[in-house]
């Protein structure tokens, strides 16, 4: 899918966020490198537009994990048939599309010599590096950035803040994540959707499946 179509879809989804400051949030996203940055330096979607693609993939994965309740007009998170949490579609959009807002102004490029296997000639090729212009953490930075423009619910705040799960966490941080999941199970749902997208939907240069990040709803 062309980057232009991904941008259109992203902005269509963000237009469903009806909160004071949503226009300023969109202005920040447009002025930043959110639409052009990679999702990583060398793992999933380490390509131009990877961050945008990944964010939409997480949105699709999160909606796919949840069940829509027509009566309450909410998404329900079920475990073994039991509803453990629920949320609005607006919140799903916020959690998924803004979970990696921290990766804006985060990457740069450098050059390295790479041998052309066909010609045997060494050529200079660009590659992505971390150049964090706002060193404020990861999930916590995403929550702080989003919160500058729109008011986040506690559920949204916890989910975005802890979306990296237990990766690289010490004991006290892991305990905080445990308590957060019990308080707001949607934390675990967003963690799972993020992993599903990065590990199962995405390769280094694009999606594994053509249908990933297709229009939903």
Q: What are the language-model segments listed below?
A:
Residues 11, 59, 63, 143-147:
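Amphipathic alpha-helical segments within well-ordered protein domains
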């Amino acid at each position: 899918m062309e980057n232009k179509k991904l941008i259109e879809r992203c902005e269509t989804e963000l237009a469903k966020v009806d909160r004071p400051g949503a226009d300023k949030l969109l202005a920040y996203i447009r002025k930043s490198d959110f639409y052009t940055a990679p999702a990583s330096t060398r793992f999933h979607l380490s390509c131009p537009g990877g961050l945008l693609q990944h964010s939409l993939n997480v949105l699709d994965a999160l909606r796919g994990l949840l069940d829509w309740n027509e009566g309450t007009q909410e998404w329900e998170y079920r475990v073994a048939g039991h509803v453990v949490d629920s949320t609005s579609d607006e919140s799903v959009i916020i959690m998924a599309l803004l979970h990696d807002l921290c990766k804006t102004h985060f990457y740069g490029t450098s050059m390295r010599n790479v041998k052309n296997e066909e010609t045997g000639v060494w050529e200079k090729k660009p590659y992505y590096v971390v150049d964090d212009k706002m060193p404020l953490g990861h999930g916590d930075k995403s929550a702080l950035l989003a919160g500058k423009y729109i008011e986040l619910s506690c559920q949204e705040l916890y989910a975005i803040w802890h979306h990296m799960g237990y990766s690289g966490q010490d004991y006290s941080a892991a305990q905080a994540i445990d308590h957060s999941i019990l308080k707001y199970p949607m934390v675990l749902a967003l963690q799972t959707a993020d992993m599903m997208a990065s590990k199962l939907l995405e390769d280094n240069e694009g999606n594994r499946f053509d249908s990933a990040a297709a229009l939903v709803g």
